[in-house]
């Protein structure tokens, strides 16, 4: 897939309701599987449906489909083989069969807590389905094994039809996060406010959404073959921006005299507008593709520092505490630097 592909309004709408889309896909897959079972009169017809739901339910993005498909099919086949061996051992010795099943379930539990949890889960599920057959009825066990494999293949087929891309979902979520960040930024530093706004819940939501995006990094990297380090860098900067915004708000509203000085710094306000424009350009790039690097205008920041020094001299009689003022300016400079780095990383992520 092209990483710089422009997102259509329809795609954005679909991906914003991806849980509804995935639920609809699972429902249609269940109905079609049920009709296939009835049409061909497949024995032990419960197990393809059970397997399809177990396998298809957790899969959502295309980056997870292919690797997990092999995990699931491998787990299903191995579980079937272990189950058939267990049924043969039961004819020889029940204690030996129990030891064999215990060893197989130990393998299931061990894999379930490793890098291939779904494979371990399906080994255990398939083993339980197969050994649940009546004693000595190998035909029933074979049908159950085949039904589980059939359910696995159908689940992979339905998941691969119009799959959702984790990379596109990541782009939309990052654009949404930056948009919300811009709104909170404007609300916190609006010159029309007389008192500090209560934005704690909004900041917490920004941080929570940033943490949730980490789950998209692995499948997005597999889909685009873009190194995970780029996604991790964007993730870190996104989280840092939220943390620095909270510190900026604290410094901006620290004391009334210092807030009055910052409020009257015209060049500092110009810097705030510059950062808002950078955020808007990043959001536009994430939706439209083909981004251009953003270079911060550090001269505006230097001019703002000089202006603040003059304002402090003019308001020397107010005994203004300088620490919040210079802390706020430094945080502004660091925020602009972080946005510049974020722009460069987004350009690398949205390359052709």
Predicted regions and their residues:
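A membrane-cytosol interface segment of integral membrane proteins
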Residues: 240-247
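Long, hydrophobic alpha-helical segments that serve as membrane-spanning/inserting helices
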Residues: 1-23, 169-234, 247-352
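A transmembrane helix-and-boundary motif of multi-pass membrane transporters/channels
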Residues: 1-210, 217-218, 222, 341-351
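Secondary-structure capping and boundary motifs in well-ordered enzyme cores
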Residues: 74, 78, 233-237, 267
């Amino acid at each position: 897939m092209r990483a710089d592909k422009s997102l259509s309004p329809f795609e954005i709408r679909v991906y914003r309701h991806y849980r509804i889309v995935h639920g609809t896909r699972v429902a249609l897959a269940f109905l079609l599987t049920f009709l296939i079972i009835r049409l061909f009169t497949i024995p032990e017809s419960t197990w393809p449906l059970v397997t399809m739901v177990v396998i298809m339910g957790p899969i959502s993005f295309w980056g997870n489909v292919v690797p997990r498909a092999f995990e699931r099919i491998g787990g299903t086949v191995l579980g079937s083989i272990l189950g058939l061996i267990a049924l043969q051992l039961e004819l020889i010795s029940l204690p030996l069969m129990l030891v064999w099943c215990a060893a197989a379930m130990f393998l299931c539990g061990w894999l379930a807590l490793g890098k291939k949890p779904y494979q371990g889960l399906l080994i255990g599920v398939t083993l339980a389905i197969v050994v649940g057959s009546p004693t000595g009825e190998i035909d029933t066990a074979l049908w159950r094994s085949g039904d589980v494999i059939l359910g696995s293949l159908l689940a992979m087929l339905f998941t691969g039809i119009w799959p959702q891309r984790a990379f596109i979902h990541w782009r939309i979520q990052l654009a949404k996060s930056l948009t919300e960040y811009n709104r909170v930024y404007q609300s916190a530093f609006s010159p029309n406010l007389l008192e500090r706004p209560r934005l704690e819940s909004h900041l917490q939501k920004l941080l929570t959404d940033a943490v949730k995006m980490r789950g998209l990094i692995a499948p997005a990297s597999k889909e685009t073959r873009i190194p995970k380090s780029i996604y991790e860098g964007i993730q870190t900067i996104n989280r840092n921006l939220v943390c620095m915004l909270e510190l900026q708000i604290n410094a901006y509203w620290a004391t009334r005299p210092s807030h009055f000085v910052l409020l009257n710094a015209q060049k500092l306000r110009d810097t705030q507008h510059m950062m808002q424009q950078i955020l808007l350009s990043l959001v536009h790039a994430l939706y439209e593709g083909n981004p251009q690097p953003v270079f911060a205008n550090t001269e505006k920041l230097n001019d703002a520092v000089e202006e603040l020094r003059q304002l402090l001299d003019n308001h020397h009689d107010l005994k203004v505490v300088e620490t919040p003022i210079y802390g706020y300016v430094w945080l502004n400079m660091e925020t602009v630097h972080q946005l510049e780095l974020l722009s460069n990383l987004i350009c690398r992520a949205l390359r052709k």
